[in-house]
UniProtKB/Swiss-Prot annotation:
Record domain PKS/mFAS DH: where: 997-1267
Region described as C-terminal hotdog fold: spans on this chain: 1130-1267
Pfam families per UniProt: Acyl_transf_1, KAsynt_C_assoc, ketoacyl-synt, Ketoacyl-synt_C, KR, PKS_DH_N, PP-binding
Record-annotated active site: 273, 408, 448, 720, 1027, 1186
Organism: Mycobacterium tuberculosis (strain ATCC 25618 / H37Rv)
Keyword Oxidoreductase among UniProt keywords: yes
Gene that produces this protein: ppsA
GO CC field: cytoplasm; peptidoglycan-based cell wall; polyketide synthase complex
Name of the molecule in the record: Phenolphthiocerol/phthiocerol polyketide synthase subunit A
Gene3D superfamilies registered for this protein in UniProt: 3.40.47.10, ACP-like, Malonyl-CoA ACP transacylase, ACP-binding, Malonyl-Coenzyme A Acyl Carrier Protein, domain 2, NAD(P)-binding Rossmann-like Domain, Polyketide synthase dehydratase
Role description: Part of the PpsABCDE complex involved in the biosynthesis of the lipid core common to phthiocerols and phenolphthiocerols by successive additions of malonyl-CoA or methylmalonyl-CoA extender units. PpsA can accept as substrate the activated forms of either icosanoyl (C20), docosanoyl (C22) or lignoceroyl (C24) groups from FadD26, or a (4-hydroxyphenyl)-C17 or (4-hydroxyphenyl)-C19 fatty acyl from FadD29. PpsA initiates the biosynthesis and extends its substrate using a malonyl-CoA extender unit. The PpsB and PpsC proteins add the second and third malonyl-CoA extender units.
Length: 1876
């Protein structure tokens, strides 16, 4: 190396700079791992660049080098390495070419097998636990093959269904692999599976897949079937451009090579069952011959068609018992299986060089062929022995040295002996008797995975070699008699076995034989454990975890998965190793987040925060784009110092320590003290000289720290004295010169200490200049930002100006400095400054610098003595410098980093930039932060500075630990299959008569009908057993029921009602079966014609699809509780002979297999325990139905008549049965001459019922099979549900107010009335009467700052004719929130009480009253958020005289109220919740069939539920509006639709399938023109008139009252207030049958944070009252949160506040039950809230007064403060989940992750501890433990009784309206109390 290039890092930076200068890209666009070609380097550029590099490095660099090392990182590493000699290079190449037997390292593995196996570790656990993944074929897997003629159906029915199946084979993460949904649909799922597992294997290997681009990496993939391609091309109309590549076998390997851009061999291998082991053999060969440098070997197998099953069945190869019993005497064939496995291979020398984990070593392998054996598929023992000998010869190993062989071991009676004899002959003979060859087969666990079988055995064997244990061979009980194990010196491993101790590395072989004769054997050996070299194993003090993903959601998912893993399986993996793997062994992705942590606990907490998208210490969430190029280092002046700064950096950051050490001699010389010692000892800098010198030293060292991580400045800016450090970094001064300037300046200033000062003001420059105009000695010293300035001058004048600014409610504060720089006070120092620095000889800066010293920013300063004299005197034009940098003519800079020990300027920087360039993207960062971990803070900011790719960190050579692989985000991809061609209908599905499904379009907008057609053949029945009535084969009623229930389930229903059996289905001749679902009706009919439809149809059963499928589970539970247990006096009887009982009644045989385990009879009740077959297909209810139907007919054993089902009132399905034992409970409710009626419940033991039948009616037959029909008994409504509803449906009842008792803590005596400020145009009339009562009233707004009481008299008239109710509400709301803000900012020792007066809102008859109504909701929230300043709200009659109200107001001011108060005729009323009583005034809602119904917000989650509810009540036409339009119906099938849009479309389709016409309209309900256009369009089209309204539109925007803005308020009020007013005008009273307003309990309960939302909902309540009085059926429903969806974002806040009062949220089912209940009553406003239990006699409960944990009045002030601090620390630490001792009492809560929910929880605990109610904003106003304790001490500390303590007492009695309402709940009727 020559010149200044001294290593790889320098070369990397040089190359980046070269590309930026010559190619035209920006630094942020240069990815060092991207190929030079992708960065724009052409061949011509390469020639020029090679010349530049040759000159720079002093040796020849060829352009060809750029292609051999195609990235910046690769090229820098190559050029930095010593130049190899030509001779040695040739020798290496010659040696490598001759190394054809080099060992191959296995460096990574991945797998996916049935049984939940998704990684090698899971496979190992699965094997060791002796588990099996074999089951029957999934129900839907063969559905496309169930068509065809009866003979095909018969063949399918006789085909073995045992197998080992992967779930969700249609799931694939297409987005991750950049594959369109259309292409993914046509891709063979084997291709998809291989992509995912290969990626996982590379991550397991620690090889970032992205680094393999254009590398000589080979792919060798074993696969042997392409069933998906055949299925996809069966219908030519479905073939498209993706079909060929989607179905071709070769693409299985090629697809992976294409995606990863691999340039080595890419081969799909098909040798049938040996494919994947042959793939491993070929991969090893390719590595040894240098065809590739890394190889991916794989095998994949999926079973999509029954064809191969049937073929193997025909030759007897498949096990009829469903088990692979390898080497066992009972072996009867194999079981087919699915799965995929991938291994990553390297030459062993390469793996050792690269520091890879070597899982095992492949020593040798061989492949051969059986040739002409005893048949194409018959094994050849001689060939098997030959391949074994060849493999061990290739491995250079004696056969007797192998310890274990993973055998092919399929479990065939003759195949196993042939393989065993070959193994024994070659590998077993000659072994000691006590050291036999151990053998086993993974097929006994996973089945025969065919093309993946070899790799499954290989991965198992590698794991065994690693762990030193051999998992057992399953199902081995008796040795196969044809295998002489003793003679062959072999033993089957039948238990978990320790690897034999042999004195040599563990060695094993793996065999795999293809059924066409291709044999393979691979020899592996234990890998050598790599131990870190001395010193390498030291963990860094701080670790950075880089969590990457293609999207932010993927980053979140990965972070959550890592946190779970680190707490669980990865608990023993060192944090540094986890970080190392994430940072260096995972591919870079477009999005990444980072977590910096010192220990595992911090790391897990950070990962959880990252997963949730929350801010937390050390966490940087993914950047939403890059801010652009250009980095500015900003050097602040004085003020960032703190004791302990830099100490951790000295210990943990070598670059920082080196910079301090390099600076130390110069620093000691210039400063006179040691910077190193000050930092290392955590000493505090004292005095001007020490502070300023220490800070510049710190800044210079921090600059080197940033640069060491590759972050270098393109421009520097200095703030005041910070310009010295900026000049040094820019190269204008040396460090010694910079220290000299600082020392001189500090020394000259020191004598002026105490004679001046500075203050930071929240004022812009013009305002500041006007402020100081009368103070000539005060100057504007610093232009900080558009909103901040700093003044300098004499101390007394500075303090006076601070007071003036604060009086204007603006921020002003002294700056911690004892002199006044940038002020005329410096004039006297300038001559000395010029004199002492006269010999200073600055240089031209090498880095751009903008000086803040001169008014003209374009001045090119010379940093000499004159400059520094001017610098200390002139104002600092920091704002102007930052604005110039952010928008300069030479190009804007976008990243600003403040180089300081604590950020002083970051906010000023961002304010300035956003003001100068609105909408532009900038980043403003600090470096360190006071009193935090230096290293964690710096690394966090370092990570924030990197938005395109994470910062480079050291890459130690030690192996990485395996951590969880990328979590996939699967979506469904499958072809649209058509059933095989043939005659009409298909074969019925198993257990049902359902066949091919067709959707039939209907006229107009009605939902489609559904048709299922099947052909029933006598020899291919869909059930296994027989079922004969008097010698005639009849389809059992259970199969018929199973058929229509299955159809209902496919349509989204889980219940049927009004089931009627009409005629039996004779199964002794072919029949065509049709099931038709049209709207709610479903029926089953058949025709005797076998080939085509006939007109001779017989209807067999009819039913109605249940209208409330969601209620099925609850009805099942209810029914089970009533009937699920036998009576107390029941006795267990002997089990009768079931077959005999059935035979007595003429029934022969059962269609399904089930047996009776116990029989318990008592009177009309019978409970029978039944056992189901273990292999019951998942989701099958056929056997359960069969048992229920047959046993119900036997409920009276003594009655021997034949009973046949006639009808069922309702049948409901619940949970799937999970065990073999179930209980059938029968309750006979009627028994007469005509028949019996039975209620039936079926449930597994201790589980939720899975099946319920209510009123199953049987008809008694004397002879024959003529099934009649019986009418079910009249149904009864769910009375119990309505009883529950009365517990949480309330109205507001107004009762006379009671005066608080002066003896309890809520009372107060006001003895010193204070000033009253009356705000409002109508307030003058109150003044005189209040003055007479001892108050000092004034109609004013300026007097608010001094008033004890503030009375806001609500305006009653709009500001103009065009002001709408929304405009009015926004205007008044803005006034009041500003008023609250002013009062909240007053000092705690000057409290005030806010009162609001409204008129006529209680009745809401007059328009002016309706306009004011929103204030009721706003008042409740103010009371909840600021109980300390709340007085109350009083509503006067519309015509009340304010002057006459004065005395009453004077009395009320002394009695603050939580509640809204209404004053009528001199009586003050307060609200209370009252249960709805009396007889209903109307019947339950029923919609007109000829009308339409409008739901605003109808496309939201809540609106769609309401649409379903109206449909249940007979609505046939629904108009659903939402602001976001749905796509055209032609696009509803697109896969690109997002999840939410898909949910809406599916809900609409479900409604249409029920016969409901749905019109989805994009309309803004608050916009009068939109609604008018909708109605006009309907009128033009002659649409049905709208006869009902549900106004459900609304949004939330939670903000504290003091933070509310006019725009935010309008956003919330627009749909609620504006929308309801538009609807009110469009549908006046009398024009509709009902007018429902969906409001929120927030409107009356005062939920903190929901001021605008509560206000809007109060308006809805008032509108409902107004319309009611005009005779319209209008109701405002004040909901609490709906569980699961509720009031959107506010649901949890509402639930938290309700929980505080002992209430809760409600389920949708409860909500609709309550709605139906209250709709029958004449109620305008219904409050739906679960009522808390009433308080006990002792006064405890929801309405108990707060009792403090301490008696504060008897404690000293210091004791109060100490107790409060300790108690608060305990409460806050518990909620924040940090150790109490680690909670810094001076640290802001926001830095600890405080959110609004936590704040509310802390507030509740603090209220109980302190004994008074507290403000919702308390924690934000007092953001540390110390400041909060200080605030509360003022509230509770003892002092003299005065005005102050009276107001303090006032705050203790105030609170939320929610508290008040619960305090005043009226007594419920006795039955309600009992239910409570």
């Amino acid at each position: 190396m020559t010149g200044s290039i001294s290593g790889e890092a320098d070369l990397r930076h040089w190359l980046i700079d070269y590309l930026v200068t010559n190619i035209g890209c920006t630094p942020d666009e240069v990815d060092p791992d991207l190929s030079l070609a992708d960065l724009g380097v052409s061949s011509r550029d390469a020639v020029v660049l090679s010349g530049e590099l040759s000159e720079l490095l002093g040796r020849t660099v060829s352009p060809i080098d750029f292609w051999e090392h195609p990235t910046i990182n690769a090229l820098a590493a190559y050029l930095a390495a010593p130049e190899p000699s030509p001779d040695s290079d040739a020798a290496v190449k010659r040696g490598a070419r001759n190394s054809l037997d080099e060992p191959i390292a296995v460096v990574g593995m991945g797998c996916r097998f049935p049984g939940g196996i998704s990684c090698p570790e899971a496979l190992w656990d699965f094997l060791c636990e002796r588990r099996s993944s074999i089951s029957q074929v999934p129900p839907q897997r063969w559905q496309p093959f169930e068509g065809g003629p009866p003979e095909v159906a018969a063949a399918l029915a006789r085909t073995t269904r045992w197998g080992s199946f992967l779930p969700d084979i249609d799931a694939f993460d297409a987005e991750f692999f950049e594959i369109s949904p259309s292409e993914a649909d046509k891709m063979d799922p084997q291709q998809r599976l291989l992509l995912e597992v290969a990626w996982e294997a590379l991550e397991h290997a620690g090889i970032p897949p992205g680094t393999l681009r254009r590398s000589a990496t080979g792919v060798f993939a074993g696969a042997c079937l392409s069933e998906y391609g055949a299925m996809a091309s069966a219908d030519l109309s479905q073939v498209d451009g993706w079909s060929n590549s989607g179905g071709a076998m070769s693409i299985i390997a090629n697809r992976l090579s294409y995606f990863l851009d691999l340039r080595g061999p890419s081969v799909a291998v098909d040798t049938a069952c040996s494919s994947s082991l042959v793939a491993i053999h070929l991969a090893c060969q390719s590595l040894r011959t240098q065809d590739c440098h890394l190889a991916i070997a794989a095998g994949v197998n999926l079973l999509l068609s029954p064809a191969v099953f049937r073929g193997f069945d025909q030759v007897g190869a498949l096990s009829p018992t469903g088990q692979c019993r390898a080497f066992d005497a009972t072996a009867d064939g194999f079981v087919r299986g699915e799965g995929a496995g991938v291994v990553v291979l390297k030459r062993l020398t390469d793996a050792q060089r690269d520091g890879d984990r070597v899982l095992a070593v492949i020593c040798g392998s061989a492949v051969n062929q059986d040739g002409r054996s005893n048949g194409l598929m018959a094994p050849n023992p001689a060939a098997q022995m030959a391949v074994l000998r060849a493999a061990y010869t290739n491995a250079g190993m004696q056969p007797s040295e192998v310890d274990y062989v993973e055998a092919h071991g399929t479990g065939t009676l003759l195949g196993d002996p042939i393989e065993a004899r070959a193994l024994g002959t070659v590998l077993g003979r000659g072994r000691p008797e006590d050291s036999p060859l151990l053998i086993g087969s993974v097929k006994t666990n996973l089945g025969h995975t065919e093309a993946a079988a070899g790799i499954a055995g290989f991965i198992k064997t590698v794991l065994a070699v690693q762990h030193g244990q051999i998992p057992p061979n399953q199902h081995f009980e008796t040795a196969n008699p044809h295998i002489p194990f003793t003679d062959l010196r072999m033993k089957v491993v039948d238990t978990q076995t320790e690897w034999p101790a042999t004195g040599h590395p563990r060695r094993a072989g793996v065999s795999s034989f293809g059924f066409g004769g291709t044999n393979a054997h691979v020899v592996i050996e234990q890998g050598q454990e790599v131990r870190p070299a001395p010193g390498q194993g030291l963990s860094p003090a701080v670790s950075t975890l880089v969590v990457a993903g293609k999207t932010m959601q993927r980053v979140s998912a990965t972070a959550g998965m890592l946190a779970d893993w680190m707490e669980g399986p990865g608990a023993d993996v060192a944090l540094a190793d986890v970080a190392h793997t994430l940072n260096h062994h995972r591919s870079r992705q477009p999005k990444f987040g980072t977590v910096v942590a010192r220990d595992r606990t911090q790391a897990i907490a950070g990962l959880r925060a990252l997963a949730a998208g929350q801010h937390a210490p050390g966490v940087v969430n993914p950047a939403d784009g890059s801010p652009g190029p250009g980095t500015v280092f900003v050097y602040s002046g004085r003020g960032s110092q703190w004791a302990g700064m830099g100490r951790q950096l000295l210990a943990d950051e070598p670059a920082f320590a080196a910079a301090v050490a390099e600076l130390e001699p110069v620093f000691v010389e210039q400063a006179g003290f040691s910077l190193h010692d000050v930092l290392a000892n955590g000493e505090e800098l004292v005095g001007i000289e020490q502070i300023q010198l220490g800070l510049i030293g710190m800044q210079l060292a921090l600059t080197e720290l940033w640069c060491s991580y590759g972050v270098r400045p393109d421009l520097v800016i200095g703030h005041s004295m910070g310009e010295v450090a900026a000049a040094v970094v820019a190269g204008a001064l040396t460090p010694a010169e910079g220290l000299r300037v600082t020392a001189t300046r500090s020394r000259l200033m020191a004598p002026l200490s105490g004679q001046g000062g500075m203050a930071l003001l929240e004022l812009d420059a013009p305002t500041t200049e006007a402020l100081i105009a009368d103070f000539p000695q005060v100057t504007l010293g610093i232009y900080n930002s558009p909103r901040q300035t700093v003044i300098a001058g004499p101390t007394e004048q500075i303090d006076e100006l601070i007071a003036r600014v604060r009086a204007q409610n603006r921020f002003a504060s002294r700056v911690n400095i004892e002199v006044a720089p940038h002020n005329p006070a410096m004039d006297a120092l300038q001559p000395a400054m010029r004199s002492e620095l006269a010999d200073l000889t600055p240089r031209t800066p090498t880095i751009g610098i903008i000086s803040t010293t001169y008014a003209d920013l374009h001045t090119q300063p010379v940093f000499d003595a004159e400059h520094w004299a001017t610098n200390m005197r002139n104002p600092v034009r920091f704002q102007q410098a930052i604005a110039s940098a952010g928008s300069g003519a030479d190009g804007a800079y976008h990243t600003f980093i403040e180089i300081s020990a604590h950020p002083l300027l970051t906010q000023a920087i961002i304010d300035t930039l956003h003001s100068a360039q609105p909408g532009a993207r900038y980043t403003s960062l600090g470096t360190l932060q006071r009193d935090t971990d230096d290293v964690v803070t710096f690394r966090t900011n370092l990570n924030k500075a990197h938005t395109i790719h994470p910062p480079h960190t050291p890459h130690p050579p030690e192996p990485h630990p395996p951590i969880p692989t990328t979590p996939w985000q699967h979506t469904r991809h499958w072809i649209t299959t058509k059933y095989p061609a043939g005659s009409v209908g298909s074969a019925p599905r198993a257990g049902t008569l359902l066949g091919q499904h067709t959707t039939v379009a209907t006229v107009s907008a009605s939902p489609p009908s559904h048709l299922w057609q099947a052909r029933l053949a006598p020899d291919a029945k869909p059930y296994q057993g027989g079922h004969r009535f008097h010698q005639v084969e009849v389809v059992p009623a259970s199969v018929v029921l199973h058929t229509i229930l299955s159809a209902a389930t496919e349509l989204g229903y889980s219940a049927l009602s009004e089931v009627r059996f009409e005629q039996p289905i004779f199964a002794d001749r072919p029949r065509l079966i049709q099931v038709v679902a049209d709207n709610r009706a479903i029926s089953l009919a058949s025709s005797p014609a076998a080939g085509t439809p006939s007109d001779r149809w017989t209807r067999h059963v009819t039913a109605q699809l249940s209208s409330s499928p969601s209620d099925s589970a609850s009805s099942l539970n209810e029914h089970h509780r009533a009937n699920g247990q036998p009576p107390e006096r029941a006795h267990r009887d002997l089990i009768p002979d079931l077959a005999e009982l059935l035979a007595m009644r003429g029934i022969d045989g059962l269609p399904f297999s089930w047996t009776v385990a116990s029989w318990t009879q008592h009177s009309s009740n019978l409970t029978v325990a039944i056992d189901l077959p273990e292999a019951l297909p998942e989701g099958s209810t056929g056997p359960l139905l069969d048992a229920a139907v047959h046993l119900a007919a036997l409920s009276d054993v003594a009655d021997s008549r034949l009973y046949v089902p006639a009808s069922i009132e309702q049948i409901s399905l619940g949970d799937v049965v999970t065990g073999p034992r179930s209980s059938v409970t029968l309750n006979r409710t009627a028994h007469d001459d005509d028949g019996i009626t039975v209620d039936v419940t079926v449930a597994a033991h201790g589980e939720v019922p899975s099946l319920s039948m209510r009123s199953l009616r049987y008809r008694a037959l004397d002879f024959g099979l003529d099934v009649g029909r019986a009418q079910p008994p009249a149904s009864t409504g769910p009375v119990e549900a309505y009883c529950d509803a009365t517990n949480f449906v309330h109205t507001i009842d107004w009762q006379p107010q009671t005066v608080p008792d002066a003896t309890h803590p809520g009372a107060e005596q006001v003895t010193h009335p204070g000033p009253v400020a009356i705000i409002g145009d109508d307030g003058a009339a109150l003044c005189e009467t209040l003055e007479g009562a001892g108050y000092q009233p004034a109609v004013m707004s300026d007097g608010v700052s001094q008033a004890r009481y503030v009375v806001y008299v609500a305006d009653s008239d709009p500001a103009g004719a065009d002001e709408t109710d929304v405009d009015f509400a926004v205007r008044i709301c803005t006034e009041i929130t500003g008023l609250v803000r002013t009062l909240a900012e007053r000092d705690a020792d000057k409290p005030a009480a806010l009162w609001i007066l409204t008129r006529g809102v209680h009745e809401s008859v007059a328009p002016s009253a309706l306009r004011q109504s929103f204030l009721w909701g706003l008042a409740g929230v103010i009371a909840a958020e600021h109980p300390e300043l709340w007085g109350g709200l009083v509503d006067l009659a519309i015509n009340d005289d304010l002057g006459e109200f004065g005395p009453a107001l004077a009395e009320l001011l002394a009695k603050p109220s939580k509640s809204i108060l209404v004053r009528r005729d001199g009586v003050v009323l307060a609200p209370a919740l009252a249960p709805v009583r009396g007889e209903p005034a109307r019947k339950s809602l029923q919609c007109r069939p000829d009308a339409a119904y409008l739901i605003t917000g109808g496309l939201g989650a809540l609106g769609l539920l309401m649409a379903d509810w109206l449909a249940d009540r007979g609505a046939h036409r629904l108009v659903l509006t939402g602001r976001t339009p749905l796509p055209p119906r032609r696009d509803w099938q697109l896969d690109t639709l997002d999840t939410e849009l898909r949910r809406r479309i599916d809900a609409i389709r479900a409604l249409e399938m029920r016969g409901v016409t749905v019109e989805a309209v994009a309309a803004d309900v608050g916009c009068r023109e939109d609604v008018q256009a909708l109605l006009a369009a309907r009128d033009r089209d002659g649409a049905a008139p709208i006869r009902g309204i549900i106004h459900a539109a609304g949004i939330t925007n939670d903000q504290l009252v003091t933070s509310m803005t006019g725009d935010a308020v309008r956003q919330v009020m627009w749909p609620k207030i504006g929308g309801s007013q538009v609807l009110h005008d469009a549908f006046p009273p009398g024009s509709v049958d009902f007018f429902y307003l969906t409001a929120s309990a927030a409107g009356i309960f005062g939920i903190p944070g929901q001021g605008s939302y509560a206000a809007a909902n109060s308006y809805l309540d008032a509108l409902a009252r107004a319309r009611r009085q005009q005779g319209c059926h209008t109701m405002s429903l004040d909901w609490v949160a709906w569980r699961g969806l509720g009031l959107a974002a506010d649901a949890q806040l509402v639930s938290e506040e309700l929980a505080r009062m002992g209430s809760r949220d409600i389920t949708p089912s409860e909500a609709f039950t309550a709605w139906e209940f209250v709709d029958g009553y004449d109620v305008a406003q219904a409050v739906v809230v679960p009522m808390p239990a009433p308080a006990g006699a002792d006064g405890s409960g929801a309405n108990a007064y707060l009792l403090p944990a301490r008696n504060w009045s008897v404690m000293a002030a210091t004791e109060v403060r100490s107790e409060l601090e300790q108690g608060l620390r305990r409460i806050i630490a518990a909620e924040l989940r940090v150790p109490e001792k680690e909670l810094d009492t001076d640290r802001p809560f926001a830095e600890l992750g405080l959110n609004s929910l936590m704040a509310m929880a802390i507030r509740r605990e603090a209220e109980q501890f302190v004994g008074i109610e507290l403000s919702a904003t308390m924690l934000f106003n007092h953001p540390t433990v110390k400041s909060l304790a200080s605030y509360l001490a003022k509230r509770v500390a003892p002092h003299d009784v005065s005005q102050d303590n009276q107001i303090s007492a006032l705050s203790s009695s105030a609170g939320s309206v929610l508290d008040s309402l619960f305090d005043r709940i009226e007594s419920a009727p006795p039955e309600a109390e009992r239910s409570v």
